[in-house]
Amino acid sequence: MEINDITKEIIGAAIEVHKTLGPGLLEKPYELCLIHELKLRGIKCESQKPVPIQYKGLVLDDSLKLDLVVENKVIVELKATKEILPVHRAQIMSYMKLSSINNGLIINFHVKLLKDGIERFIDHA
């Protein structure tokens, strides 16, 4: 499956979840429902995937967990916050670098229209 097709499926699934649940919940219910929706669509998804951090011979095994990794190609960072902040953008860029996954999405469910809560990231490095 091509990266644009995967991204389209993720966004479509997130829109379906948001349409059903609406804004205002905490992050976890959105995560669980999005995982379920992706599985219903036949999309492979891992939740809370650990990524080891390596620093000069030190390996931190459990210090980083990615909200979702879809088809081993896209990191999905879920939010239920008033707005996506620069720290959230820096967070997903760091996750992409540390995991060697070059594509990411931030999906913020705490918005009236979900299209206003989605940002896509591509690391060209």
Name each model feature, range by range.
Residues M1-K44, K115, R120-A125:
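Solvent-exposed, charged helical/coil patches
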Residues G22, L66-I84, Y95:
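Conserved catalytic cores of phosphodiester-cleaving nucleases, focusing on short active-site segments
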Residues K39-K56:
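A short acidic/basic microdomain associated with nuclease active sites
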Residues C45, L60, I75-V76:
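Short, isolated positions in well-ordered beta-strands
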Residues Y55-V59, K115:
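Acidic pyrophosphate-coordinating catalytic loop
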Residues V59-L66:
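Basic/aromatic recognition patch in beta-strand/loop cores that engages polyanionic ligands
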Residues K79-A125:
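Nucleic-acid nuclease catalytic cores
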